[in-house]
Every structure is written in C-alpha cells, then in structure tokens.
C-alpha cells in the first residue's frame, strides 16, 4: 500500500488550513459548519486510505467472532426474594435482564430488555441499575448520546411502563432503605456547568401510577471546583456513604439508610492530601486512609458518636492497601505488593469484639494475574465469588467456600479457534529508566515463538494511579496468532507498584512516565523479545498523551502509533476551567496559572511539541460527544502533525460522530472498530 503524507494537494489539512490560525483553534467551534466539513473530509481520507485493508479487517472481525461464544449468560445472583441474571443473544448488541422467585426457576421472566431501550439509538449506555429494597421496582440511568449526561427512569417489575423521572443527572443512583407501600427515596447527583457532579439530591418516588412528581431535595452541594460528589450504600444496608473528593483528598459523610432525611454525619473531614474510604459492620466503621503514609492503613471506630479511630492494620512500606469490603464475619482487603506489582486478597475474620480470628491470603492460581472480589450483595455470605484472569487465561469465576476452603468453578469464558490460551506464554521483564528505576514490562506471545524477536505492540497508560493489571483479550488473539508480541509498559503514574509509583509519575514528576515508556521499548529490544524496526506504540486517553509525547521525542523508535481518544492539548485544556474535568485535574497535571507549571506542561504537551521530522504512521481516533477529551484535541494534532510530517508515513484521523469517550456502545460495532485498528497495526508491522 502506498502511504500518503497528510499535506498532499487536496488533503483536508491543505484545504482547510487558515493562515490566520496556524494552531487550528477554530476547530474548537462545535457549531461551525467548517468543523463538521473538516472532520467529514478527514474521515473520508481515512476511509480512502484504509480501503485496501478492508478485506483484512473483515477477516479479523469474522475470525474474532468465531473465537467467541456470542450467546452469553451471566452468573445468577440470588437476592432476598428473587434471583437475577442477564442474557445476551448471539446476534444482539445488548442484553435482557431476567429474574425468578427464589427456588422457582420455572417462573422466570424478562423484566428489562436493553435491546428495546437501545433500538434506533445510535448510542446507548446504561449508567446504573438499582433495585428497590423489596426488589419490585427498578430505577436506571441511561445516556443515548455519549456525552455522559444521564436520564433517570423507573418501572414496576416485571412489566410496568417506564416512567421518566429526571434528566441531566450523573450515572449512579442509589435507593435508601425507607421503602413503604407508597414509595421510597432515591439519591442521585447533578452537574454544574462544567459537568462536575457537584451536588447530591434525594427524591421521594411515589409508586402510584399517576402520583404527582415530587420536587428533589438538595442534600449536599460541593463548592470546591476540584471536588466531585458521589453516593453509595454499605453492604450492611445500614448507611448511605457520601464522598466528596478530589484526585488526592476525600471527605466522607453518611446518612442512616432508613432515615435519609436526617442531617449528615461526618465520618472524616477533609484534610488536604488525605484520601479515605469507609465501610461498615454492625457497631463499627472501618477507615482506609493515607494519613500516616502513602501506602494506606486501616482504622476502626465504634459507630457511636464522637468515637475515636483506632489502628487495625498498620501502614507498611512494601505493600499498599487498595480496598476494603466488609461482611458480617469480617473483611476482605485488596493489598498490592510493590515488589511484583501483584494484588492479593486478604481475608480477615473478626469476632464480636473485633478481635482477629483468621488472617490469611486467598491463593492465586498463577502470577501475575488479576484476582477480583465480585460484588456480593449478601452481608452474611460465607461464600465469595472471585473473578480471575491473566494475559494467557480467560476470565473465570469461582465460588470460594470460607468454611471448607473449597473453590468451585462457576464459569469460564470459552475460547474457540486454532490458538488456545494454553499455547500462549507471558513473562515479565524489567526496564532500567533514566534515573535507574526498574520499570516492569509485561509481555504475552505465542509459546512456540518465544525464543525469537517478534513484531510488537507496546501499550501504556501511566496516569491517575490506574494499574494495568493482567487482562485477557479474545480480540488480541488475532495479533498473537499472526506472530505479534503484546507488551504493557507499567510506567510511573500508574498504580502497579503502589501509591509512590503513582506519585512519581504525576505533576512535577510526569517526565518519568515518558522516560519509562521509551526505556520499556529499549528493554524489549535488548531482551530479544522485539524487533527494533517493528514496534507499534498504543495508548488511549491519558495513554494517548504518553504515546504522543514519546513519538514527538523519538519518532524513530516506532514504526507506527495508535492514539485512541488521546489527551494531546494538555496546556490549553488545563488553562480553560470551563471545560469538563479541568479543575478536577489540577492535582494530576498542575494548574498552569502558575508560570512554572505552565512551562512544565508546555515541555511535554504533545500538541505543543510537534516538530518538522519524520513521524511514524499515526492512527488517531476521536469522538464527537467526548466530554473527557474534546474531539478537537485529536483533530488539531492530526492537522499539525500532517503539516510537520517530513516522511511518507500516513497521518490518519477518524472521528466517531455518534459516540463519546468510551467509543461504540454496541458490542459488534466496538469489535469491528477493533478489527480495523488491528488491520492498521498488522499493516504497519508488515504482516
């Protein structure tokens, strides 16, 4: 295929360039017809260039489908009165939700058909589903555009007519425990002008069919523009927990779940830099916090007023406590080892006096792997549901009997086709970064090719303390079967090695992320895993920032790069507090009102560091309704790199005009988009 530089005569960039606006800021005007025309032209250029690869994309897509079990049924969950599950038909994008009275499966009925809700909608995302305490009413939120502004609906189960309650709210909704025959209270969040969930509201929902709509009551409004409000309910069903938090500070308030109209109770007042989460068992609260150190410790206090916090699990230097789940019998803790970047589930059984009866770790099937505690609605459950997966092992669900220790396999995602998971091998190597820090790099490949350098897809993220723990991908098998190695650079800024790893890759230390990613690339070559001239870099969202910066600095390091809804115009975005997310991101990137911060961000912001040089082939994806990374960021980057390109490699932009930050909502379109992206990757790798 002949590559075409983006500035050839007649290209969108050449046709729409404005000499009076060389930075392409005019693309930020969503109402302009020229903007729509430019994006349409770029999409057409993308389609024209891609046309010869369409047969390969079709092959990848259908091969991917053949590997999957397209008809999917979730595990059943028995609540107090009914058992619930979802089923997705082999030809369906969306599921149906089913239930039956406990012990009477012959009386099953579909109570919510997502297919009907999504019909004739170009985009559909269900933000949340919440069952009333008696399990006879369903509240849910839905977004039909992709801009993450949700509408609240209600219906009686199983076949009531849906009633729209509210629009323009946050995705989550929570029932209080005050239900009567007449109604119950729902809690939800609303946005300010920058789409920050700044307020918590309660609404009395009358169940009578023609009951008048009540006016929502404000519970809490958060004035600090860096703080977001959220609400949830403890597994004990005793308390509603309200968090108002920034990226590094949390305030926790509470309401008795059966008395949501009472005054808020403060469980932890905000302290700058102190993050907190709270859970509950009868008579006691638990507090996970970093007040005494960056790796968190666990405290407890009596439920009574003015009780003081007492340490239960002390801060450690070699592991970070990442989460706590309370049950009647004790706690499950998520604990991340800094040495091997592995999360362990720790079981802590407590007696009625809160003394430790048992302290042990739940066994892992292999390392590295991901082991997660599935949400269990039963506070007194003596059986836990675990989800486990790795780079070579598809997701499996187990029931762990706490009394006998017996693990029972409940479900495993089936994988069909010629490449079985058993034919894969994963390994971890360590890259030495510019300052001597050892950066973990995970790799998965075909076992029969593990002794030779391979074409490689290198993925990275490195922000917000998010950890890229091992995950299995059926779509990834299309690349692996064709001889590609898939590698993940666990760069600083992520959470793979605990809170210090995150802190070492944010704010003034952000440069470490970029050094780490390039060091990972060098380590893969030095370890004879990767062929130096056949490495594609890939990153999404903040990972797009990582990749965008690295291709500016070392374009020769990669034969191509994939930037999916990439955060590229960092300085300009952070200088505009009217955009969604900006003020909440000050603690991640810094506030550029300070000249030194602006200078620092300008030093790496991808769009501000484009140079006339030979760029690798670029596949850039944006979304029109994206409220996290505005469509114009990838569009401007595409335009300016096209102008700067000194080589022949293509610079391609595709903007999805019917979705948001998460891409397509229907699974078949999402899989087809993945196949197109993979076709580009294989082309770039010469496969």
Roles of regions detected by a PLM:
Residues 92-93, 147-148, 194-196, 226-227, ...:
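Flexible loop/turn segments at secondary-structure boundaries
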Residues 237, 249, 275, 282, ...:
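Active-site lining segments that contact anionic ligands and/or coordinate catalytic metals
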Residues 115-129, 142, 146, 402-405, ...:
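Cap/lid segment of the alpha/beta-hydrolase catalytic domain
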Residues 103-105, 145-147, 157-160, 176-181, ...:
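Secondary-structure transition/capping motifs at alpha-helix termini
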Residues 491-687:
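Active-site-proximal cap/loop segments of hydrolase catalytic domains
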Residues 187, 241, 253-254, 286-287, ...:
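Structured core elements
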Residues 88, 290, 389, 459-464, ...:
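Glycine-rich His-Gly loop
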Residues 1-383, 389-395, 400, 473, ...:
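Beta-propeller folds
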């Amino acid at each position: 295929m002949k590559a075409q530089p983006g500035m050839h005569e007649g290209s969108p960039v050449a046709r729409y360039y404005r000499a009076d606006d060389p930075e392409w800021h005019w693309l930020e005007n969503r109402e302009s017809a020229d903007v729509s025309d430019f994006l349409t032209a770029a999409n057409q250029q993308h389609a024209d260039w891609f046309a010869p690869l369409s047969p390969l994309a079709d092959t990848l897509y259908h091969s991917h489908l053949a590997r999957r079990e397209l008809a999917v049924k979730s595990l059943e969950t028995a609540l107090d009165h009914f058992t619930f599950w979802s089923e997705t038909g082999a030809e369906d994008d969306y599921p149906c939700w089913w239930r039956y009275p406990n012990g009477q499966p012959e009386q099953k009925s579909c109570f919510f058909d997502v297919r009907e809700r999504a019909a004739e909608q170009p985009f559909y995302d269900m933000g949340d589903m919440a069952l009333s305490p008696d399990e006879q009413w369903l509240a849910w939120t839905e977004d039909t555009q992709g801009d993450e502004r949700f509408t609240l609906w209600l219906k009686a189960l199983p076949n009531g007519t849906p009633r729209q309650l509210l629009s323009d709210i946050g995705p989550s909704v929570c029932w209080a425990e005050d239900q009567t025959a007449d109604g119950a209270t729902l809690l939800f969040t609303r946005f300010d002008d920058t789409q920050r969930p700044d307020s918590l509201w309660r609404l009395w929902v009358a169940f009578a069919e023609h009951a008048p709509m009540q006016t929502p009551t404000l519970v809490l409004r958060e004035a600090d523009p860096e703080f977001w409000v959220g609400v949830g309910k403890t597994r004990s069903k005793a308390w509603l927990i309200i968090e108002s938090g920034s990226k590094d500070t949390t305030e926790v308030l509470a309401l008795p779940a059966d008395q949501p109209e009472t005054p808020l109770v403060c469980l932890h007042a905000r302290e700058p830099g102190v993050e907190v989460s709270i859970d509950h068992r009868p008579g006691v609260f638990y507090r996970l916090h970093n007040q005494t150190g960056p790796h968190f410790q666990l405290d407890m206090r009596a439920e009574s007023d003015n009780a003081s916090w007492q340490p239960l699990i002390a801060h450690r230097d070699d592991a970070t406590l990442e989460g706590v789940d309370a049950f009647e019998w004790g706690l499950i803790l998520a604990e991340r080892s800094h040495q091997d970047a592995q999360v362990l589930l720790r079981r802590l059984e407590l007696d009625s006096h809160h003394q430790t009866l048992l302290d042990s770790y739940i066994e892992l099937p292999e390392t590295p792997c991901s082991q997660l505690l599935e949400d269990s609605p039963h506070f007194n459950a003596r059986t836990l549901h675990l989800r486990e997966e790795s780079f070579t092992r598809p997701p499996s669900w187990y029931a762990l009997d706490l009394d006998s220790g017996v693990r029972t396999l409940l479900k495993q995602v089936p994988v069909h086709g010629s490449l079985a998971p058993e034919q894969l091998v994963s390994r971890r190597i360590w890259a030495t970064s510019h300052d001597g820090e050892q950066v973990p790099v995970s790799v998965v490949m075909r076992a029969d090719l593990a002794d030779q350098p391979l074409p490689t897809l290198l993925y990275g993220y490195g922000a917000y303390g998010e950890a890229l723990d091992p995950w299995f991908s059926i779509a990834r098998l299309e690349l692996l079967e064709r001889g590609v190695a898939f590698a993940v650079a666990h760069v600083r800024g992520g959470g793979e090695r605990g809170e210090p790893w995150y802190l070492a890759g944010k704010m003034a230390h952000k440069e470490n992320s970029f050094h780490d990613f390039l060091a990972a690339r060098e380590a893969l070559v030095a370890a004879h895993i990767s062929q130096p001239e056949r490495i594609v870099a890939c990153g999404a969202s903040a990972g797009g920032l990582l990749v965008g910066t690295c291709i500016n600095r070392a374009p020769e390091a990669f034969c191509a790069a994939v930037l999916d809804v990439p955060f590229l115009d960092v300085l300009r975005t952070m200088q505009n507090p009217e955009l969604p997310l900006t003020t909440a991101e000050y603690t991640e990137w810094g506030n550029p009102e300070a000249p030194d911060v602006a200078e620092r961000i300008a030093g790496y912001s991808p769009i501000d560091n484009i140079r006339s040089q030979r760029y690798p082939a670029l596949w850039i994806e944006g979304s029109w309704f994206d409220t996290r990374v505005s469509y114009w960021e990838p569009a401007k980057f595409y335009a300016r790199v096209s102008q700067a390109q000194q080589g022949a490699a293509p610079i391609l932009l595709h903007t999805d005009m019917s979705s948001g930050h998460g891409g397509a909502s229907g699974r078949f379109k999402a899989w087809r988009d993945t196949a197109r992206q993979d076709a580009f990757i294989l082309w770039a790798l010469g496969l």
